[in-house]
């Protein structure tokens, strides 16, 4: 069983790497954004609660996010492991996830942190916004999102570093280079790709 988290600033290629890791290690990429969207689309009771909060411009509270993530991790494909992307985001969610996994006799194997120089990420995102004609995505807005990321994730990163779970990986470079760095970091922790990955 492989149970991983991935964190990284906007523009560090986290979504791309998450899909790749999930495929190579034969585990589902469990993204809170995807869970929210699927529940809204399916018009589940929880999905309707999320929709009402989002429509009102409010954050989805921990309790609701925790319930949605718990339900997703109980699905058949997540029983043999998972890669969590976008969760946990608060210290309360960190504690909840730990308690949840302990209740199932499980624990996290590693937390992958994609590390990227802020100036390089800002330059990358500014270029992308210009190419896509998104004038509202200026450097100031992009830097603000980077600051929010650092402020929100620093306490979580500290917790996982203290627990010896954190794997810091340089997130800049070609997609294949970054993927290889992640594989090497996980191998150092004894986590290897699934021989069944890619077989359906």
From Swiss-Prot:
CDD domains: ADK (cd01428). ATP binds at residues 11-16, 128, 173. The keyword ATP-binding applies. It catalyses: AMP + ATP = 2 ADP. The keyword Cytoplasm applies. Pathway: Purine metabolism; AMP biosynthesis via salvage pathway; AMP from ADP: step 1/1. InterPro entries: Adenylat/UMP-CMP_kin, Adenylat_kinase_CS, P-loop_NTPase. It holds the Pfam family ADK. GO terms for biological process: AMP salvage. It is found in: Cytoplasm. Residues 127-137 are annotated as: LID. Monomer. Catalyzes the reversible transfer of the terminal phosphate group between ATP and AMP. Plays an important role in cellular energy homeostasis and in adenine nucleotide metabolism. Belongs to the adenylate kinase family. This is Adenylate kinase. It comes from Clavibacter michiganensis subsp. michiganensis (strain NCPPB 382). The gene is adk.
